[in-house]
Swiss-Prot record:
EC nos: 3.1.2.1
Stated name of the protein: Acetyl-CoA hydrolase
Binding site for CoA: G277, I278, G279, N280, I281, N392, G396
Organism: Candida glabrata (strain ATCC 2001 / BCRC 20586 / JCM 3761 / NBRC 0622 / NRRL Y-65 / CBS 138)
Localization: Cytoplasm
Length: 526
């Protein structure tokens, strides 16, 4: 087939040009039940041409539910995985996903989904943990990776994310490379550490955010590369949810806390490397830092969003490391127009490095993430609404919160329901699912205030959280629950972390029955 001029410029390893194929030519390779790896992380850097061709093949041949795959991606993929879910093309999915169609299929039982700490998922895949039932000794049948260039040695230059690609390539039987000529080359931004399994590992040597010690592309055996496909579709990232009064209040509470920590010598004036999740609260915190007059900040995180660009451009942020740059189209345009400036201040690493517990602890990262709910003793639920309905997955929040110097969770004090504008309290007596334990969190913050939990006993934590974080509509209810639980526990000699199990989930059951967590009374306990 004819090779475009753009593709020839991007593919600098000549033997690969003989392997250029159309996506349609690859369709016969894919069989029901295969194990596939995709590149990508938080919806950027994912393959597009081959997954889209498979969707069309399924549509044209009425193969919905008949051509299904076990799909592994570093985190969430792009819109293609949601189309796969709509066409019943996914048997199993891990470890994180975003989108209504795939979440619906998971919660309807059509897709077997499991989430895992993102620092651990790629390495556990290489151990063969997720393919134990295979009888052919393989782990992945095909790895489909998006590249923005291929170097002279055949190695792969990824795009705006690295994710689990190095590990997936290392255990894939065959590799398909989609070279995206619609996206500028990201060559020079990456720092790749290839996987080494125990007992031959050595420590990651990074002691500063801006250190680069690995290689700037992903090595691959050219013999395993079976096809080069040109892709001409850019990543599609929707607009960020704008900050509102609630998220700005949370950001204000956090920034006041940081200033106080600096004042008392517990943080340096430029803080410590920051990790921030995604969403409007995370964006508001970063926007707040833009105006807070902190200088020479550094970032060690999973995902960079548009809000970080203002920090760079006003001189507050010196350097940022992540495994994904998840920018809107205007955000990418800002970066590409000033590429030399950003290239010298950005590093993209694999997720096993960006989320590595040893490095997070060594660097003293300040971790900030958003839960579904937290309870009065500081356990947090990040994944399952009412204990059962999966949202997206654990992601990397626990990688950071367990190991950070400061572990912070932020959320609105209350959320609306159809019948009550404050029908859901984010602070509950007992969370309906536990992702982060009371041992992981240092600080809980809502739009109502900030609870500093360091060094407090469970009952002290409960009062701090109720007084500082709970919505006024729920403070009396939560305090009444705690008082009654303490009365019960005093009689039974279990006062360390008192609960009334009979009432522990009454907020949730009341919500299911009446559309609000505002319980009218507690059931009596003896």
């Amino acid at each position: 087939m004819t090779v475009s001029k753009l593709l020839k410029e991007r593919v600098r390893y000549a033997p690969y040009l003989a392997k250029v194929k159309t996506p349609e030519e690859l369709i016969p390779l894919f069989k029901n039940g295969q194990y596939l790896g995709w590149s990508g992380f938080t919806g950027v850097g994912t393959p597009k041409a081959v997954p889209d061709a498979l969707i069309k093949h399924v549509e044209d041949n009425n193969l919905q539910g008949k051509l299904r795959f076990n799909l592994f991606v570093g985190a969430s993929a792009g819109p293609e995985e949601n189309k796969w879910a709509e066409h019943d093309m996914i048997i199993r999915r891990a470890p994180h996903q975003v989108g209504k169609p795939i979440a619906k299929a998971i919660n309807n039982g059509k897709i077997q989904f499991f989430d895992k700490h993102l620092s651990m998922f790629p390495q556990d895949l290489t151990y063969g943990y997720y393919t134990r039932d295979r009888t052919d000794g393989k782990i992945l049948d095909y790895m489909i990776i998006e590249a923005t260039a291929i170097k002279e040695d055949g190695s792969i230059v990824p795009g705006p994310s690295v994710g689990g690609s190095p590990e997936f390539i290392s255990v894939s039987d065959k590799v398909i490379i989609e070279v995206n000529t619609a996206t500028p080359s990201f060559e020079g931004v990456h720092d790749i550490d290839m996987p080494v399994n125990p007992p031959h590992r050595v420590p990651y040597p990074y002691t500063k955010v801006d250190q680069k010690i690995g290689v700037d592309s992903i090595p691959v055996d050219p013999e395993r590369v079976i096809a080069i496909v040109e892709s001409k579709t850019r990543d599609q990232v929707g607009p960020n949810t704008p900050s509102d009064d609630m998220s700005k209040a949370i950001a204000g509470n956090l920034i006041e806390f940081f200033r106080n920590e600096v004042k008392h010598g517990r943080l340096p004036e430029n803080l410590l490397p920051l990790q921030s999740g995604i969403g409007n609260i995370a964006n508001a915190v970063i926007e707040g830092l833009t105006d807070a007059n902190f200088k020479h900040l550094n970032v060690w995180t999973e995902v960079l969003q548009d809000s970080f660009l203002d920090l760079f451009e006003n001189g507050s942020l010196d350097y940022a490391t992540a495994t994904s740059i998840r920018l809107t189209e205007p955000g990418f345009e800002r970066v590409f127009k000033n590429w030399d400036f950003y290239k010298s201040r950005l590093c993209l690493r694999s997720q096993v490095v960006s989320n590595n517990p040893e490095l997070i602890r060594r660097l003293g990262v300040i971790a900030m993430n958003t839960p579904v709910e937290a309870d009065i003793y500081a356990h947090a639920n990040s994944t399952n609404v009412n204990g059962s309905r999966m949202l997206n997955g654990l992601g990397g929040s626990a990688d950071f919160l367990r190991n950070a110097k400061l572990s912070i969770m932020h959320c609105p004090a209350a959320r609306p329901t159809k019948v009550d504008p404050t029908g859901i309290s984010s602070i509950v007596p007992m969370v309906s699912h536990v992702d982060q334990t009371e041992h992981d969190l240092d600080v809980l913050v809502t739009d109502q205030g900030l609870a500093d939990l360091r060094g407090l006993s469970p009952r002290e934590r409960a009062r701090e959280i109720i007084n500082k974080c709970a919505h006024p509509d729920y403070k009396p209810l939560l305090q009444d629950y705690l008082d009654r639980a303490e009365h019960y526990a005093t009689k039974h000699g279990c006062l360390h972390e008192p609960h009334m199990l009979k009432n522990a989930f009454k907020f949730h059951t009341n919500l299911a029955e009446k559309g609000t967590m505002k319980v009218e009374s507690w059931d009596p306990v003896e």
